Amino acid sequence: MTITEAVAVMEEAIETVVGHATEAQTERDRQIAEDNGAEMVTGTTAPAKSTPTQAQTEAEKKAERLRKLQAMKEKHAQKEAKEAAVTAGSTRMLLAEMDQKASGTPGPNSPVAGAMSPAPTSPAPPMPYAGKFDPKAIAKSSKAARPQSPTRLGDVKLAAPAPKPLGLKKEANLKGAGLLPANRAKSSTKRKIDMDDEEVIKRKLVKLPDFVPENADSTPDAEGEGEEEADDLDLLMAQNEEEMAEAHRVLQERRDERIQKEGMAMDVDTETPNGETKDEAENEANVESKDEAVLPAPSMDVDEDVDPLDAFMADLEQTGSAGGIGSVPARQKQKAGKGFEPEAYFSDDDYGYEEDKADPSSILAMASKKKKKDIPTIDYSKIELNQIRKNFWVEPQELSQMTEDDIADLRLELDGIKVSGKNVPKPVQKWSQCGLTRPILDVVEGLGYEKPTSIQMQALPVIMSGRDVIGVAKTGSGKTMAFVLPMLRHIKDQDPVTGDDGAIALIMTPTRELCTQIYSDLLPFAKALKLRAIAAYGGNAIKDQIAELKRGAEIIVATPGRMIDLLAANSGRVTNLKRATYLVLDEADRMFDMGFEPQVMKIFNNVRPDRQTILFSATMPRIIDALTKKVLREPVEIQVGGRSVVAPEITQIVEILDEGKKFVRLLELLGELYADDDDVRALIFVERQEKADDLLREVLRRGYGCMSIHGGKDQEDRNSTISDFKKGVCPIMIATSVAARGLDVKQLKLVVNYDAPNHLEDYVHRAGRTGRAGNTGTAVTFITEEQENCAPGIAKALEQSGQPVPEQLNEMRKAWKEKVKTGKAKDASGFGGKGLERLDKEREAARVRERKTHKAEGEEDDFKEEETAEDAAKKDKAKSAILAAASAIVSRESAKADASEAKPLPAAAEGAVKGGVTVNAGKGGALDKAASAISEINARLARAGQLRPGQPIDNKGPDAGAFHATLEINDFPQKARWAVTNRTNVAKILEATSTSITTKGNYYPPGKEPPSGSDPKLYILIEGDTELAVGKALSELTRLLREGTIAAADAESRAPASGRYTIA
């Protein structure tokens, strides 16, 4: 059959498909109608006309779709006929190419497989097919033609398809018309098969023509995609083998073109055996012909008589024999003797990561470093810092005209201001002279501040000039505004905070309450100047504060502990102090009194060196002068009213009472206070937290509304308590010294020191909660005769404030000084803070003890404690005591022998007594002394044959062991005695040694000897059949006794609990 005849047969088959489909549909409709009629006869409940009507409708739809398909095909055939004259040469070229492929001998000028070829076109309209369409007959004729194919197995070539189709419409038209299924245009991921042992070449599998069984039913389905697939299958079956391969070539070309247009990720860059990409091979194929290394695609030119798998395997063998080293792609190299080595994408090696070796020392060092919360150290010498402006002070003309005498008189009038330093600016007298901006002055006027206070008059010009300042002023004198107003001017002069920049101003306070109060005072100014401020203190979730810092802030008000947490969080990436140029310590002296010096110094060392530092407090003892020299540079010291002085507006009353009369006197004071005015507040200070809760219950029982606040309460409770106290919800508040700093309540008229403060600074701050901002108040202090240590501070405060000192209080002060002189008592200033390192050590020691207690049997310790001199002394003491208590192992035969014949303590027991180290007893030093002590004990026991004078050794019964030893435990601590008599420990020793352990004697208190004729002191008798068993048991008992003794000594040396709470 020639190519022209094949084209004619294909067109006739298309015409026949349409007619056959119409007849088949009509036959199905008739069958459905007959079935529905049978159902009506048998009495079914379905309507009689519904099904035939529906079948007719479906038949009409099917017929309409087939008519549209036929019209499209006719239009396409007419267009091809018009192009036949133009493409006649191309058609002849295509026919010649197909004839050459069928004969197996390529012509001299034939194009290489893979080059672009025009699509087949029919030169004339098809002739009608006179016969009946029979798919089975067509399949049989196709099968009969297969043996005549000249293509051999070895001649099958695989090559990439041609890139472009010519003269045909896009595949979307065929799919929309129902010729192609919707999912056929989608390409699945190509699987790559490795069946070669030496070389691997990446190949792409192409879908082969659909296999149609000979007895397949060609009746199209009536639903969805089944109809389209049936029509397409009928179309393919109506062709011969060569035309079928050509049709698949066209479909593959259209599919590739659509994929390229849609940008789908397909493997179109597959390498050829020569190392070139497919596109490069195709471009070269258009210029010159290639050798047979370039193989045609199996889905285009492979005859159906060759099995696809056989063709693929044969092609692999041919390529493997012809390929060289260069044919193996770089990403699919194969190791000798091994399978295919996959390539890792997005590997850690691509980024240069290197895994550190698991060094235990480095892991422990890293763990301890994370636990320590170290702040990243910043070396400012290697950082180029921007220059900042700190001096904003311009002296007004009014002040410049004042003489030195005028300035001295002015300072004397302003509560006796004292300044020290070089070139101290003159004090101002009104807000307009301070050099503040207009928005700041508007807020000041809105808050009702008419004129500056004494400390503000002198501190504002000094701070505005950029100098470091130490400010000491009485409580309630406006110290907060003295450092806040210059801070705002300092911040506005610098660039805005952006990105990861830290804050410009940092204010640190010792208590959370003072932190919140300063923050609330800042808010009106920050809002007016569009600045952001953050209050960072403990008790609240740190994640919220970190989130605020991430958004950026110019001002941070914080406590030292929480500030260190923020600086150390995430290895210092949360915030930093690189831009912090204004640093304030409010109530600075109390920070160091509370033990914050290490934390404060860490923060100071992390701030840039050209900062401006301001220290403010109501008390500034000389003891912290050394600190100020470390952190300040040429400071100006300002004192208003002297150091540690109670304001003159406060009336101070000191009463010496017994402990039982304090509460009655407190009720009298409260009754007198609220008899005159109901809208007043009273603040009661106590020493301990449990005392605050106990006093709260007693006051509530008397009908007074009150609340308590102390460090043991949650921060939210503390905040709400202070808020309610200020609003008057609860007019009485009971607190520890945690509320003695920064608490500012205008209606506070009475302060009661229920428990007297133990040093001057605490007393000044407690009394300073009242009489603030020019108001009057009363401070009453209860002191007992036993509290002589509190008398010196209270008496000094009365003297400095110009108030009389009670005679009895003066006598108590003298008595205390006499005790200090004679050495019976020790005076303490209150500044004994050493940071939190001591607490960390105590927690670590407790953790080690807990791990030892809960350690599983046989588990080895994974930590090593550092033995101090104190620990060594405890072990030596326990060792000597055990040496004196343990006896030698004596047999029944030698019980009455001479002391020189007694057997010494075996090496195992002696090693246990000496701390687990066994040595020869002949060496000098302390070991000789221990050996001589053991010999003396053995000699005494063996010579007399008695445990104690007058007491026989009681292992003479019929069941007594051949060897025995004793261990006296009467004079050891209770923990040690319990360790060697505990049933669990004894049972383990009995099981391990097969000995008998008996506790005998009576317990006598330390220092008491047993009377004559009574039982001896408490001891343990160890009996066994062999000397080795008795020695092993004695060794274990002495080890337990030594550990118990050391544990008891540790418990005694530890400081007792704070006593704030007790467990009932």
From Swiss-Prot:
Its EC number is 3.6.4.13. This is Pre-mRNA-processing ATP-dependent RNA helicase PRP5. It is an enzyme of class 3 (hydrolase). One of its GO terms (biological process) is mRNA processing. One of its GO terms (molecular function) is RNA helicase activity. It is found in: Nucleus. ATP binds at A473, K474, T475, G476, S477, G478, K479, T480. A motif (Q motif) lies at residues 429-457. The Q motif is unique to and characteristic of the DEAD box family of RNA helicases and controls ATP binding and hydrolysis. It catalyses: ATP + H2O = ADP + phosphate + H(+). It comes from the Eukaryota. Residues 460-638 form the Helicase ATP-binding domain. Residues 220-231, 858-870 have a biased composition (Acidic residues). SMART domains: DEXDc, HELICc. Residues 835-848 have a biased composition (Basic and acidic residues). ATP-dependent RNA helicase involved spliceosome assembly and in nuclear splicing. Catalyzes an ATP-dependent conformational change of U2 snRNP. Bridges U1 and U2 snRNPs and enables stable U2 snRNP association with intron RNA. PROSITE patterns: DEAD_ATP_HELICASE, HELICASE_ATP_BIND_1, HELICASE_CTER, Q_MOTIF.
